[in-house]
Amino acid sequence: MAIELPLTVHILYHKEYKEGAKVYSNLYKMLCRDSHNPFASGLDIPVYFHTDENDTSLQPVPTNLSAKTFILILVDQNMYLSKEWKEYVINTLLKQQKDTVQICAVSLYKYAFEFSSELGACQFFSFGNESLLLHWGEFQTRLYDNLIRFLNIDGLNQLRIFISHSKRDICSHGERLAKDLRDYLLQRGTKLSSFFDVNSIMEGGDFESQILESADKAIMIVIFSETYSSREWCIKEILQAKKNNRPVIAVFDIDGDIDRVFPYIGNIPATIYKNDWTPVVNLLLRTTLGMTYQKLLLSKFPDDLNKVAFAPDAYCLSNIPAENRNKEMLYPEPPLSYDELEILKNINGNKVNIMTPMQFNAKDCNFKQRSVAISISESEDQHQNGIGQDMLDDVTLEMLRHILIANGKIVYGGNLQQDGFTERFRDLSFQYGQYRHLALGKQEPNNPEDERYMTAFIAWPFHLTIDNDQRSEFKHCRVDIHFCKPCDMVSPEEAKSGVEGTDAEKREKRARSLTVMREDMESSKYSDGTNEDKELLARIFIGGKTVSSYGSKPGILEEFEISLKHNRPIFLLGGFGGETRRIVDHINKVPGKEIVGLKQIEFKELNNQVTDKNEIEVLSNSTNIFEIIPIVLRALNNIAK
């Protein structure tokens, strides 16, 4: 099922801008996901970056990846002085601007506004020409606001914040905070308006209808003070907002005990006021952007589903019309815990599934604890596709996360280089163990600490540096580690002490020992949880360096040839560049892209049961995980049957 994304964001900066990579990484975590915490909630908005690295020519920003495209140009002194960047912006970038493409710029230099008169007509964010990282909170506010209005599903040109608060606290604590927030919105020039009942209700108008109508259309901040849950109008306001699927957050500021917490204030983001309203407003805007984006994304799924753009609760279920209560329900990632879902299903009479988009795509998938190998490394050309390290980490960990959720296991081979994928996958295995405990509830095995979700093959001589502390960490994270033997060039003494010889001999020994590891991975048998050992279910390739660090050929290419020799089902995700892209181009017989020494094959020889031409095209070229992952999951499920 092809899913058109509602929005993609593209960051453009000069290669000499020192904070460019950091800004991109922060934006990726802010708008998409934090790949180091894959089971946490994210907004799912893909973020790409574009720069002039390696003096490659600047290419047009791809606007066919999503329904709308937001382009953010970081204009620093280096870009201001660059003739190439100026010509690119004027002759290429600005000509792409249309209703579905919005361009904004950030002034990082005092003369940035002079960079291009044509660009000057676009919106500029300015923060006193100082480091963007020093003004990150204010930048978040402005970016969130722009993205919400760009998506604009409610037809609003200005966001209005409804400040829901109690006036009955001791010393009017909640009311004073509400007034302080109102004044902040007025004085800081946030371009956000507020609904504050003392000032916003027109004289002579119906009090109740004005409040409820405003709650219908605004985004809401709840000032949760000690008397909030006991005030009738506070309850009316929040129920009205939730009934109409409005974004709501809570700000906790309690001075004393609470007799009762109103139960239907749950399942919303919350924070604590710490004498600064900027983080509070940013949490509300992030929540609003997330719900806006999710409404558009979920609308791409079949119409015979109930869809909510937030984590569902009992009040949400009560608002579903009777005629729709037999429909399955779709809500955003990440999945709710087992116990929470059980409560919701019981309320609904256990009639329907309540699931996330990825669970919907894999709802009938069961890999029967078969093992799937992943081959991945960074590539030299990933920047040419706008792909940063955060995106590569993200797509890989999302793929593995859903394989684990579909009752599969992971196999990976590495050399424990600093910042390598081995340790990231180890951390994922640990987090999945925690998630599985919540997700399965009473179905959790009697001895969950004995479960293993991943097998890590570590080549000689790299495993010689692993101490007992590291081994304990792998065990704690439910990872089996397999220390591979060295190649036949290595003597028994050298196998214990480490690689010896000339530089050329050392490289050759490492290269051949990596080959031994790859052959071990491919030929080993893996437990499927039924006391029966089976071969790998399949292997997935992503990225990969195009030049080997040790041997005569890139590691990804060698692993591909070994898998091909064993007739292993293979998935090539070519959209992320690297050696995987080169293999895809070789199969497609792209002129000038042939790989010397690699035999010519057809896609059907990958044995992955993906036969539809459109799906082959997606796997070969797409970076959209909502397209890629369901195709891979369905194919793996067919192979596992």
Task: Locate each region found by the language model.
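C-terminal interaction surface of TIR/SEFIR-family domains
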Residues: 1-33, 57, 78-81, 107-186, ...
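Conserved beta-strand-loop-alpha-helix hinge of the TIR/SEFIR fold
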Residues: 16-17, 52-53, 61-112, 168-169, ...
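A short acidic (Asp/Glu
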Residues: 20-25, 83-86, 115-117, 173-176, ...
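Acidic/glycine-enriched connector segments
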Residues: 29-41, 52-63, 68-72, 76-86, ...
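Residue-level detector of buried hydrophobic side-chain packing
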Residues: 106, 163, 194, 220-221, ...
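Conserved small-residue-rich
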Residues: 159-223, 304-337, 370-408
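Polyanion-binding and phosphate-handling cores
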Residues: 175-199, 206-292
